[in-house]
Amino acid sequence: MEVTLERNLGDKPLRIQTGKLAKQASGSVVVSYGETITLVTVVGSQELRPGIDFVPLSVEYQEKVYAAGRIPGNYFRREIGRPSEKETLTARLIDRPIRPLFPKTWRYETQVIATVLSMDQENDPDMLSMVGASAALCISDLPFFTPIACVRVGRIDGELVANPTISQQENCDLNIIVAGSRDGVVMVEGGGQFISEEEMLDAIYFGQESLEPLLEMQEELMEKAGVPKRSADPVEKDEYLAAKVAELADPEIKKALEINDKLERQDAIRDVKKTVMEGLGEEYEDRGKEVSEFIHDRTRVIMRAMVLDEGRRIGGRRFDEVRPITCEVGILPRTHGSALFTRGETQSLGILTLGSSGDEQRVETLYGDETRPFMLHYNFPPYSVREVKRISGPSRRDIGHGGLSTRAIKEVLPSKEDFDYTIRIVSEILESNGSSSMATVCSASLALMDGGVPITNPVSGIAMGLMAEGDKIVVLSDILGDEDHMGDMDFKVAGTKDGITSVQMDIKISSLTREIMEKALAQARVGRLHILEKMLTTISESREEMSPYAPKVFTIQIHPDKIRDIIGPGGKVIRAIQAETGTRVDVDDSGLVKVSAVNLEEGEAALQMIKDITAVPEVGAVYEGTVVKIMDFGAFVAILPGTEGLCHISQLDTKHVKKVSDVVKEGEKIKVKVLELTKDGKIRLSRKALLEEENGKSGPENGAPQRDKNRH
């Protein structure tokens, strides 16, 4: 049955249609807003996946280039290879609010695919894909019962706007995505230009209020679809074994949770299993996996009870206490800037590299090709958490953490007019026990200052947690990995002393009240400023001088008509300049030439070559040129690269010249003076004028040839 529903969102209608496309999927919807259209499908396998202890959900987001009326620019002219950064980040946005809503015992492979079919350059398909994913799940036979809606919130000239267009987003000083259900907000992602905590709260709850029509549509769709829902296979629990494990494990778990050191604590928890297995005897020696699951469950219960009932955290920290912090800068001598930020057992090494405009990242998107002068890359090697894994390209998590940190830092970067460099920061996570993305923000900020990049303000970040059961609610600052894993919220906040630049929030409970979120943001501000103070004791402002190994950038403006002279046939000339001087030369369509060099001498040498190539002859100027061709009537002399003029036979010498070759030879270097630039582009030269000047004589006006007195 074909069903189409429509509600106004912002200044235009949003439509959800089902029953027309992809009807063999478990659920499929087409979401339209303006002329942007996405197809979202969901399929749940009919076969149980045994031997796993997690929900096997995968989410894919695909931006088809045809949606924007374009052909892919790669060799194959089709979409190939890994998803783009935008596709990866959007897939994570879709995944995060829906994953917690599946039954914890769901063990059937489930795949959500969002495909952008049409893009109008004004309405971003990411929000449509998030709404579509929830709608497709709601009308499917999968056990997904809670509609989730999503809206982008922007602020333009102080006014909050729901779903600003792409062009409007350029004028927003706040830009966040809010996802929520009937119960409340479940996810927040975005940032802004130094936003206060109260302003951020207002934006989040403005977004929550804007979700109402989208939730109504999905509820109506569910009712009209009327598809019976499958149930998750219940996991049979051996209550006797669970009780026995609790009896044997609880005392040892409590002791382990008193250990502050992460690795020692993990080893102690691992030893708990050995103790329990010995206590259970041979009868249960083949039930090790179940025992491990029961121990994990008891660890969660005991740790949460420590916090909620006893008011204690792992290692004895206060709820609002930040772990010890150390900062170092300039630790890598050949890089352009470096910093080591350590907070407890989380450590990030930030490395700054500066480049020319030619080093900017070029990205093909549905909006067209764009360049990015700032990049921040996050790496999480397995040794950082004492694991052994295959090293491959960046994971979705790596890309997501990099995106979060990028938002935090980019607001404090100087403009291209003030600092004409491409900036790349790499964060190497050397060890991790919670909040490595916020450690990345701190190390990146320190590395920028160490490298002499004139940022407006340093940025720090903190991860907040939550544990809530009934009326018992505790907000935790600077959470550990265990507190994140066994807690109810992961709320990352980054910013300067003047306000927030980046936020990311995910919760595992049904919703948060405004009061809890307000407390979390206020507590986060105190923690952020504490971390910032520690950073500033190491380096208080950007260095006045950049690293001697950083490139020097020189610029020169040339006439656009001269661009082809610098490039040369097939790039021959520009490659020769770069090879001879050891520099990098970039030219844009306006004729702005940028030379990137390691030292001053190389840069000036390249600039001089460019000036010589693009120089325009001036009347009265003297040039040392090379005779390139001899004719009966004179000699052609190359006075500049690609520029030749004629020195007439009468202008070769002060005395009468019978034969040109008697005075000059091909390949000979001679000095000549420019007499005239004719309207048809020809250049008249004179050697004779210079000889007369050397002899103290003045030739005829304008260098006109003299009549031979012996001729009648």
Curated annotation (Swiss-Prot):
GO terms for molecular function: 3'-5'-RNA exonuclease activity; magnesium ion binding; polyribonucleotide nucleotidyltransferase activity; RNA binding. Belongs to the polyribonucleotide nucleotidyltransferase family. NCBIfam families: polynuc_phos, PRK11824.1. GO terms for cellular component: cytosol. This is Polyribonucleotide nucleotidyltransferase. Its EC number is 2.7.7.8. Residues 551-610 form the KH domain. It is found in: Cytoplasm. Coiled coil: none annotated. Its cofactor is Mg(2+). Involved in mRNA degradation. Catalyzes the phosphorolysis of single-stranded polyribonucleotides processively in the 3'- to 5'-direction. It comes from Desulfatibacillum aliphaticivorans. GO terms for biological process: mRNA catabolic process; RNA processing. InterPro entries: ExoRNase_PH_dom1 (IPR001247), ExoRNase_PH_dom2 (IPR015847), ExoRNase_PH_dom2_sf (IPR036345), KH_dom (IPR004087), KH_dom_type_1 (IPR004088), KH_dom_type_1_sf (IPR036612), NA-bd_OB-fold (IPR012340), PNPase (IPR012162). Its main location: cytoplasm. SMART domains: KH (SM00322), S1 (SM00316). Keywords: Cytoplasm, Magnesium, Metal-binding, Nucleotidyltransferase, RNA-binding, Transferase. Transmembrane segments: none annotated. Residues 620-688 form the S1 motif domain. It comes from the Bacteria. It catalyses: RNA(n+1) + phosphate = RNA(n) + a ribonucleoside 5'-diphosphate. Residues 689-712 are annotated as: Disordered.
